[in-house]
C-alpha cells in the first residue's frame, strides 16, 4: 500500500448538471451516504451543494484507489521521499469516472474531533482530508495524519500578511516588487498554514503562528523554519490551473 494519495476533481460537470437536466447530479447524489445527502440538502447555495457532493465522490474514489494501490506515477509515496514539490500531482479524477466506479463499500463511517477535523471511525490507520476552491475539490488519503488545502491567488492586504505571518515570511513575500509573485507567495504560505492546522487537527486559529516556512535551499519548494517540526512533518506542494495546493503529512498521531 502506498502511504498517501492526493487527487483533484473539477466539479463543473456537477454544476452544469444541477442547473440543467440534473441527470448526472441526481445519479451522483443517490450514490453518496445518507449523512452526506442530508448535509447537501441542508445547504442553500447550489455551488455549496456541488462542492459537498464532489467531496463525497472524490473521497470514495481516492480511498478505494489508495487502498488498492492502483495508481502510480502521481502523488503517491512515503515520508522517505523528501521532495517538497512534485510536478505531476495531483491525480486528476473526473466526475464521470468517480460516478461510474463508485464503490459503496469504501464509504467508511466518519466522525469529527472537537475542532472539526474528520476521520474514519473504524479505520484508525487510515486518514483523509478534503478542501475546495472555486470549481475544484482536492482530497488526500494517507497512512498517517494529514491535512490539505487549495487556494486561488487573489488580492490580499499587507496588513493580513503582517498579522499572521512571521517576519521571515513577510519579508520573503515582499522581497520582490512583482505583485503577482507577492500574491503567489502569500497563498503558498497560507495553504501551508491551513494544511498544517488541518494535519494537527487544532484549527487555523491555534496553529497560524505555530509553524513558519522558508525557501528550501535544495529545491524550489518551502520547508519548515523550525527543523524540529520538520523532523515529524513533510510538505507537498503543487499548482493546478492557477490554484495553489499544499499538503502536510505527519509521522505522529495526535
Q: Which positions does each model-derived feature cover?
A:
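Core catalytic alpha/beta fold that binds nucleotide/phospho-ligands
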Residues: 1-254
Amino acid at each position: 500500500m502506498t502511504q498517501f494519495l492526493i487527487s483533484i476533481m473539477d466539479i463543473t460537470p456537477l454544476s452544469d448538471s444541477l442547473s440543467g437536466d440534473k441527470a448526472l447530479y441526481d445519479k451522483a447524489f443517490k450514490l453518496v451516504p445518507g449523512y452526506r445527502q442530508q448535509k447537501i440538502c441542508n445547504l442553500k447555495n447550489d455551488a455549496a451543494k456541488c462542492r459537498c457532493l464532489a467531496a463525497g465522490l472524490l473521497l470514495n474514489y481516492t480511498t478505494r484507489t489508495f487502498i488498492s494501490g492502483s495508481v502510480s506515477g502521481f502523488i503517491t509515496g512515503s515520508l522517505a521521499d523528501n521532495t517538497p514539490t512534485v510536478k505531476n500531482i495531483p491525480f486528476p479524477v473526473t466526475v464521470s469516472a468517480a460516478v461510474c466506479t463508485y464503490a459503496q463499500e469504501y464509504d467508511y463511517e466518519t466522525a469529527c474531533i472537537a475542532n472539526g477535523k474528520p476521520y474514519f471511525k473504524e479505520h484508525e490507520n487510515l486518514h483523509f482530508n478534503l478542501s475546495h476552491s472555486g470549481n475544484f475539490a482536492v482530497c488526500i488519503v494517507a497512512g498517517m495524519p494529514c491535512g490539505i488545502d487549495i487556494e486561488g491567488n487573489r488580492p490580499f492586504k499587507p496588513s493580513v500578511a503582517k498579522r499572521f505571518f512571521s517576519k521571515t515570511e513577510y519579508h520573503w513575500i515582499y522581497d520582490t516588487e512583482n505583485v503577482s509573485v507577492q500574491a503567489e507567495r502569500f497563498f503558498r504560505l497560507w495553504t501551508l498554514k491551513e494544511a498544517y492546522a488541518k494535519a494537527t487537527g487544532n484549527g487555523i486559529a491555534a496553529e497560524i503562528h505555530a509553524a513558519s516556512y522558508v525557501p528550501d535551499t535544495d529545491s524550489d519548494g518551502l520547508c519548515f523554519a523550525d527543523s524540529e517540526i520538520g523532523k515529524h512533518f513533510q510538505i507537498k506542494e503543487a499548482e493546478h490551473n492557477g490554484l495553489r495546493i499544499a499538503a502536510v503529512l505527519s509521522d505522529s498521531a495526535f
